[in-house]
Design a protein with these regions (language model features):
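Active-site-adjacent substrate/metal-binding segments within catalytic domains
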Residues: 256-433, 450-489, 574-580, 584-587
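Substrate-binding cleft of secreted/luminal carbohydrate-active enzymes
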Residues: 490-491, 497-498, 664, 679-730
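Glycoside hydrolase catalytic-domain groove-lining segments
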Residues: 584, 588-603, 607-677, 692-696
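Extracellular ligand-binding interfaces
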Residues: 93-195, 216-218
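Aromatic-rich peripheral "rim/lid" segments of glycoside hydrolase catalytic domains that contact
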Residues: 510-522, 710-774
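Active-site clefts of carbohydrate-active enzymes
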Residues: 387-392, 451-461, 573-587, 655-691, ...
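Polysaccharide-binding and catalytic clefts of secreted carbohydrate-active enzymes
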Residues: 322, 332, 346-403, 460-462, ...
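Short carbohydrate-recognition loop motifs
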Residues: 79-99
Length: 774
């Protein structure tokens, strides 16, 4: 093995950013700070730089850290180091920095390496979420960087494989845009799909391990860090191709042309032969202990109400189906025909000539659209653009003119055979209306927003605006919502998705920063008036402000002082005291606003769909105050959890409320797509194992009543409107099931009720938590 040497330089945090990298028609999220060095810092020394010409054949692993590596090879950032007898280094996080961790600094050419492997342990009693960010020489976050995340359970040791993107020829890479992942495994975050300075592993200068500050002072250990060479047989020739050879890169089925993989569709005959193969497979595999709703026929007979409901049975939260059978919602999102839609405007040269990109009056016109619904990245704000639906066109090629009817029928047969029992969010109405498989419904709120707010998917709807409730009423009066409200196969309603709750107090601050007519702002001022009295003088004393009267506060947008000023010892004591009071008031009204949001929705759902469960808002970015309000009003609280497991999840503040996972997934790069999604794995086998581990962990968690995989089919190789192009389907772009994943889905799905029976009660689980914390 080659050993690495380092040149040390001190880095200090300058800023931190919350980076959405989600998905759903959206996303989960990753945290990635910016690190900057002081102006008087010396330039980095290029120690142990490799070049291809100097690289021996075969390439040896490159050791960054092991038992022989001195601790001064690590640059700490608000952590304390301790060398263990094993040679591993234990890092204990401080509480001062937002991003405690440590860095390896130097200069390396990792062009012949495919991944870093870090052996990490968590000796503590709480799960921890670690991140690894790699910077190239020109890095200025988010440009020139790539970030990976790892959740590690208490007492667990993992070998964390951090994939290194391939080094695609620069002039070819320059023509690739509007894609989160690019050929060779090049990845970008949600805010820089088209980074001006892409990450280049040939110019690596920093490897940064860190955690987001959580106030716990977590401990974690690093035993080894090694760069793994790319096997000669896996080195991809297309990485060196010029544009004129590389393009077009997408075949008639929407697949990447320049690689082969097991299951790739190479002809129409292969596409159509899949029908008979799968029909035989589905007929041979059927779970035996399910009723028409997917409820457990071998379980207890409970009260049958004709609708889905929640009940705690033997100390474990359960869903109960309309016939009174125990039900655990094992589902998949986006069951439909549009997962493979991709924009084609300005990218026509990506596609083979036999992909019809413009309408000509023929049958493929149905798969060509003019869209204008991109909310971020390349196509946002550009007006209308052309798109092509590879999923639907492949179904047409596979089934013929009645492709939609046959594909809908196949979806129901697949889900039952695979051991799934729920059609998740954003699925086709034609499939849900068939009343063959339970489903969840979803509605949104189109009312005016809090103008001072912001968010990846848009501003936050103002729950104090009269239109808030009226907008929801109109959504629930729509044809399908009315159908779902009376349909026994409808489990319940999600309202909204991954809206931006911000930090505690943030929406109250946003209200103050809004115009004078903002209803949320006026409600906050009324709340302050009730606390401080009719005379604004008391507020001025508490907040350190000089408002002439309450109308003056309302008249102009007001930027409340940042909460962190309260803890800034460089500030005057009076300023800090005032900032602390402002923060407390903003937190208090934030809770009022959250309760207004959830209570108005609950009241409207009880009015329009009284038989259905309120399944919450599908939290992705959130905070304890928002969750506390949701737990008060939702029948089931929903989260989009992109993690490796959810067995360690607990409701906030010990509130005993059932929860459901609205999204999770895993992906790999061995089936022709360019991005793994938010749960990266090394291979299809590893992906299947990750799926099974996740679902088992949920089944054994007494609060979790279901999980929904995101999503039914792969995204387009060239990306949807926001650039997501993830290998996250249960089926590929040609409607071929991923055999390894489906085997795992069946294995855990067929056994899920038996596994659920092993879950400890909530009380017993909490007692075990307390014992473990001693």
């Amino acid at each position: 093995m080659q050993r690495n040497s380092f040149s040390r330089r001190r880095y200090f945090p300058l800023a931190a950013f919350l980076v959405a990298a989600s998905t759903t028609p959206t996303l989960g999220f990753a945290l990635s700070p910016t690190f900057a060095e002081p102006a008087n810092s010396t330039q980095i020394a290029a120690t142990n730089v490799q070049t291809r010409a100097e690289t021996p054949t075969p390439v040896a692993p490159l050791v960054f850290f092991d038992a022989l590596t001195p601790l001064d090879a690590l640059t700490p950032q608000d952590v304390k180091f301790r060398r263990l007898d094993s040679g591993a280094v234990e890092a204990t996080n401080g509480l001062a920095d937002n991003w405690p961790g440590f860095h390896f600094l130097g200069a390396w050419n990792l062009g012949d390496y495919s991944a870093l492997e870090a052996k990490i342990s968590n000796p503590g009693a709480e799960p921890i979420q670690l991140y690894c960010r790699l910077d190239c020489a020109a890095a200025e976050f988010p440009e020139g960087t790539t970030t990976a995340g790892l959740q590690i359970a208490p007492g667990e040791t993992q070998v964390w494989r951090i994939e290194l993107p391939g080094s695609l020829r620069l002039e070819t890479r320059a023509k690739l845009f509007a894609m989160r992942g690019k050929p060779g495994g090049i990845k970008t975050d949600a805010y820089s799909v088209d980074a001006k300075i892409p990450f280049d592993k040939k110019e690596l200068v920093a490897i940064r391990f860190f955690e987001n500050q959580n106030g716990r002072g977590d401990r974690w250990t690093l035993e080894s860090l090694v760069a793994v060479p790319t096997p000669a047989e896996k080195r991809e020739a297309f990485l060196d191709w010029a544009p004129e050879k590389f393009f077009p890169m997408i075949d008639r089925f929407g697949q990447f042309k320049h690689k082969d993989w097991p299951g790739k569709t190479r002809s129409l005959d292969e596409l159509r032969a899949q029908i008979e193969i799968e029909d035989a497979d589905l007929a041979a595999n059927q779970p035996s202990d399910r009723n028409e709703f997917g409820g457990w026929t071998k379980g207890p007979q409970l009260e049958a109400t004709g609708s889905f409901r929640t009940e705690k049975v033997d100390g474990v939260w359960r869903l109960v189906d309309p016939k009174g059978r125990l039900f655990w919602s094992n589902g998949v999102d986006c069951v439909g025909h549009w997962n493979g839609v991709t924009p084609t405007t300005d990218r026509e040269f990506y596609f083979d000539a036999d992909v019809q990109l413009r309408r000509d009056g023929g049958p493929f016109d149905a798969f060509i659209n003019r869209d204008n619904n991109a909310v971020n990245n390349y196509y946002a704000g550009r007006g209308e653009f052309w798109s092509y639906n590879f999923t639907a066109s492949n179904l047409y090629l596979k089934f013929g003119a009645d492709w939609q009817k046959k594909a809908d029928d196949l979806a129901h047969r697949r889900l039952r055979s695979w051991g799934l029992n729920t059609i998740g969010n954003w699925s086709a109405e034609s499939i849900e209306r068939a009343q063959r498989t339970p489903y969840v419904a979803t509605v949104g709120i189109g009312s005016p927003k809090i103008e001072g707010s912001s968010g990846y998917w848009g501003k936050f709807a103002d729950p104090f605006h009269p239109e808030f409730k009226e907008s929801l009423r109109r959504s629930l009066d729509a044809s399908f919502a009315r159908f779902a409200a009376e349909d026994p196969f409808c489990v319940g309603f999600f309202v909204d998705n991954e809206i931006s709750w911000g930090d505690a107090g943030s929406l109250a601050r946003a209200a103050l920063a809004s115009p004078s007519t903002q209803p949320a702002k006026l409600a906050f001022i009324d709340w302050l008036r009730a606390k401080y009295g009719a005379d604004v003088a008391a507020l001025n004393v508490a907040w350190g402000t000089t408002f002439a009267d309450w109308n003056a506060l309302a008249a102009e947008p007001f930027e409340a002082p940042a909460a962190k000023i309260a803890d800034d010892e460089t500030q005057d004591a009076a300023v800090r005291t005032a900032a602390k009071t402002v923060a407390a008031d903003c937190d208090a009204f934030y809770s009022v606003l959250c309760e207004k949001y959830f209570s108005e929705i609950l009241a409207t759902l009880r009015e329009k769909a009284p038989k259905k469960l309120y399944l919450g808002c599908r939290f992705a970015w959130t905070n304890p105050l928002a969750i506390a309000a949701a737990q008060k009003y939702c029948d089931v609280v929903s989260y989009n959890f992109y993690k490796t497991e959810v067995g360690s999840f607990r409701p906030v503040d010990g509130v005993d409320k059932p929860c459901i996972v609205g999204e999770f997934h895993f992906g790999a790069l061995d089936r022709g797509l360019f991005h793994t999604g938010l749960g990266p794995t090394e291979s299809q086998d590893a992906r299947a194992a990750a799926y099974e581990n996740y679902v088992r962990s949920a089944l054994l968690n007494p609060w979790i009543v279901g999980v929904h995989w995101f999503q039914y089919g792969d995204q387009a190789t060239t990306g949807r409107f926001d650039g997501e192009n993830y290998q996250i389907g249960l089926v590929d772009i040609c409607d071929v099931p991923y055999a390894e994943t489906i085997e795992a889905v069946r294995r855990v799905g067929y056994a899920m009720y038996d596994i659920r029976s092993e879950a400890k009660s909530t009380d017993e689980t909490l007692r075990a938590d307390r014992e473990a914390a001693k």
